[in-house]
């Protein structure tokens, strides 16, 4: 199925680089922009790396604080067990909030979003996993990278 969309640029990848490129091209340069992302907007740092790690560190800091607070006169405070399910729910809530910000920024810039995997068929044609194809003057690949996992003991 072909789309009547003929953007000036199609960006593949909705991480930090792809979202920024889309917003600049659409909002500042006035280009017609299509952006395809197969997973979640925000990329590795926001969805899988920096933000989740910081929230885990933040959550882990509470247990020692209870003991320290008691030493400074706080009463009625108890140490407890960590509930991974509760934490994971709060983590998902925050990641959904951040992804929503990325989506709204794209919408407000006039970027047409496609929640689908994109494949380059030729120098100007993109095919989505939905079966839709369209032609763009330019295609920008902003799919990020993959982590290098060293082959050493306990690397996982």
Regions found by a protein language model. Give the residues of each.
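Beta1/beta-strand and adjacent pyrophosphate-binding region of the FAD-binding site
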Residues: 3-17
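Glycine-rich flavin
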Residues: 4-6, 24, 28-31, 36-156
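Short glycine/serine/threonine-rich phosphate/pyrophosphate-binding segments
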Residues: 17-24
């Amino acid at each position: 199925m072909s789309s009547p969309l003929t953007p000036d640029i199609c960006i593949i990848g909705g991480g930090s680089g792809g979202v920024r490129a889309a917003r600049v091209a659409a909002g500042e340069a006035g280009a017609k922009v299509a952006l395809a992302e197969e997973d979640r907007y925000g990329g590795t740092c926001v969805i899988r790396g920096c933000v989740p790690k910081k929230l885990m560190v933040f959550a882990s800091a509470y247990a020692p604080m209870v003991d320290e607070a008691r030493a400074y006169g706080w009463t009625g405070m108890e140490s407890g067990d960590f509930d991974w399910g509760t934490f994971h729910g709060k983590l998902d809530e925050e990641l959904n909030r951040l992804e929503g910000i990325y989506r709204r920024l794209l919408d407000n810039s006039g970027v047409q979003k496609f929640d689908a995997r994109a494949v380059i068929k030729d120098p100007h044609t993109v095919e989505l996993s939905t079966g839709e194809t369209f032609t763009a003057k330019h295609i920008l690949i902003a799919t990020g990278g993959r982590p290098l996992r060293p082959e050493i003991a306990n690397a996982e």
